[in-house]
Amino acid sequence: MAYRNTVCTPQVIDLETEQGHSHIHSESFNRTGNDSSDQGAQHAVRGVGNATNIGLSDMRSYYDAGMNHPHQPVHNLPPNLGVDSGFVFPSSMYNPCMSTTSMNQYVSHTQSFGLPSNQVVLGSMDEGSRNENAGESARGFIKRKNAAVAGSYHCANGFASSSSSHASLNPTHRPWDPSFESNVLPNTASYNPSEYHSQTSWPSMEGSSIPSNGFNLMGAHPESAQHGNYAFPTSHISQCFQPTSNTWISQSANGIADGIPQWEYVNGMNNAPGRFSRSGMTETVNGSFREYQNGPSTLCRGPLPYFHQHAGMHAHNLLDHTQVQAPYQQCHNNPVLHGVNHSGNRFHLGPRIPVLFSNSERTFGPPHHPLLANPVNHRNIRILPPEHATIMDFSRLYEVSNVVDEHRDMRLDIDSMTYEELLALEEQIGDVNTGLAKSYIVEKLKTSLFVPGSSCMSNKSSESSMENDACIICQEEYQVKECIGTLDCGHRYHEDCIKQWLMVKNLCPICKTTALSTGRRSG
C-alpha cells in the first residue's frame, strides 16, 4: 500500500483590498509521493518533539474506516497515548478558528479555506504542542496564539489578542512563552523543518512574514477579531479545493470526553469546513458550527451534521456571490447556543440556523425573506410612503345601514288590500279634502233631464259630451226625465251622485280630468 505525506501549510486571506474581493495567494504547495486520486493511500502522521509514534497503526485503521464510511461516526476511538505525541496533521486540512471567549479549553473542529491560490506561511508545533500565528496587514498588526495541551491534542486557537488563550492540562508548564507578549517580531530567522519540504518564505501584504521557532506569521484584518464567526463546508462552494479528492482529515465532529480527544475522519472533499471573508471595512466571517464554549471537560463529541444538498443559499457581496448551502443544525450537550452572528455580514440565512451569542447581550438578525436567484441592489429599491400606497374603498361597506327603506310605509300595494285594510289605512292617513264647495258645485255644475234618444238635454251643446245609459258612480241606468249632471269633459252622472263626488275631488271618475273649471258658470 502506498504511503503519502501531504503538507498543506496554513492559509492566509488578504483582507485589505479595496475592490471587494479577497486576494488569496499561493507561493508553494509541496506534496511528495503520488499525487493521483488514490483511495487506498494513507497519510503519515508524525509526532512532534521527543514523542514516539505509538499507536499509529491504530490511527491508520480508524483513518481507513473514515475513508470507507465518510459520514458515519467512529464509535471506538483511539485512547490517549499518555505521551507528548502531539500529532501534526497537514496544515491545509485545518485552519485556526476564532475562539469566542478566553475560557475555552479546547476547540474541536478544524477549518480549511478550500480556495484556489492561497497565500501561505510556514509553521509547526513545538515540543509543548503549542502554536502561534502572528501577522501584519496594511492596517495594523495582530497576533494570533494557538496552544494545545500535552498529549494527542491538536492545537486550540485564539484570534483576537493574547487574552484569547487555552489552558494547558499540565499546570507546570507556562501557557505562553514570553516571546508571545511582543506585538512586533523584527529580524526573525527563517525556520523551516525538513519534513515540511518548504523552499522559501511566503510574503504577506507589506513584506515577508517569516516564521520562527515553530510559530506562524499570518496576515489578517485587524477589525475582524470583534465579530461573530461561522463556517460552511467548502464542498458547497463554487471554488475548488486544492488537495486531491482522497484527502481525509479530522472534521468538525471532534470533541473531548473524559480528557481523551476524539476524532472522526471524513472525506475532505465532501465535508471540509471553509472560511468566508469580506474585504474593505467589513469584517471577517470565520468560525465553525461545532465551536464549544465554557466547557471544562464537559465537551462530548456529536454526530456529523447532515447537509441538505438542494437547499441553496446565496451570500450577497461575498466572493463573486458564492452560493452555499444551509446545513442542518443538530443539538449538542453544551448549553451554549451555536450558530451564526448576524452582525452586519449580510448573509440571508435560513430559519434553521440558530444564533450564536458571543456575550450576554441578545442580538436579533434581519427578518428572513424569500431568497432571490441574484443579489438585489438595495439602493435601487423604491419604497413608497404610506400616502402613495393603494387605498381600498370601504364606502360600500358602510352602505349596509341604508338597506332598510325608511319610506316603506308609503309604498303599500293597495290593489291587494281588503276593504277593512283600506278603512284602517284611511283612518291612519286622515281626511284629505281636494273637492269643491257645495255652493260652487251648484253654481258650476250643468244639469238637464234625461230624454231617451237625445245626446244632450241642456240648452248649450258640448262637443265633449258623451251619451251613456247608466251612471258610473252608482251603476244604475237613467230613468226618463231624471235629472242628470254633466261635467266639462261631457260625461254624465246622476246629479246627486256627481255632487257628492265633486265634494270629495274635482276629477272626472271616468277620464280623471278636471271636472269643473273655476272660470265657467252654469246657464
UniProtKB/Swiss-Prot annotation:
Induction: Not induced by salt stress. The keyword Ligase does not apply. A zinc finger (RING-type) spans 471-512. Pathway: Protein modification; protein ubiquitination. Residues 18-43 are annotated as: Disordered. It comes from the Eukaryota. Its EC number is 2.3.2.27. Keywords: Metal-binding, Transferase, Ubl conjugation pathway, Zinc, Zinc-finger. This is Probable E3 ubiquitin-protein ligase ZFP1. The lineage of its organism: Eukaryota, Viridiplantae, Streptophyta, Embryophyta, Tracheophyta. The gene is ZFP1.
